[in-house]
Amino acid sequence: MEEISLANLDTNKLEAIAQEIYVDLIEDSCLGFCFEVHRAVKCGYFYLEFADTGSVKDFGIQPVEDKGACRLPLCSLPGDPGDGPQTELQRSPPEFQ
């Protein structure tokens, strides 16, 4: 690219140069994204998940279903009244010992 002194250019020329740089950056970004998606599809690690739009609430956040609290063998979940640490461990079935 040729060297241009920016002090001698009027605003129209500066805007034209800025627009050209802007368009080049956008085109390079879009082309790079297209190549990344193409490679992901060809290599098999591009997966799309389609969600039913009826279950999407405000701001596109999926509703969370309460499946109950899980219990860990050596501790209790915070907020469970009266449950202290459980010291007994489960033994494996006899065929695995």
From Swiss-Prot:
What is the predominant subcellular site recorded for this chain? cytoplasm
The protein here is known as Ataxin-7-like protein 3B
The positions making up the signal sequence are none
Q: What else is known?
A: Encoded by an expressed retrotransposed copy of the Atxn7l3 locus that emerged prior to the speciation event separating primates and rodents.
Note whether Cytoplasm occurs among the keywords. Answer: yes
Q: Family per UniProt?
A: Belongs to the SGF11 family.
Per UniProt, subcellular location reads as: Cytoplasm
Question: Which GO terms of type biological process are on file?
Answer: regulation of gene expression
List GO terms (cellular component aspect).
cytoplasm
Post-translational modification Phosphoserine, affected residues = 92
Q: What does this protein do?
A: By binding to ENY2, interferes with the nuclear functions of the deubiquitinase (DUB) module of the SAGA complex which consists of ENY2, ATXN7, ATXN7L3 and the histone deubiquitinating component USP22. Affects USP22 DUB activity toward histones indirectly by changing the subcellular distribution of ENY2 and altering ENY2 availability for ATXN7L3 interaction. Regulates H2B monoubiquitination (H2Bub1) levels through cytoplasmic sequestration of ENY2 resulting in loss of nuclear ENY2-ATXN7L3 association which destabilizes ATXN7L3. Affects protein expression levels of ENY2 and ATXN7L3.
Q: Gene encoding this chain?
A: Atxn7l3b
Is Cytoplasm tagged as a keyword? yes
Q: Which UniProt keywords apply?
A: Cytoplasm, Phosphoprotein
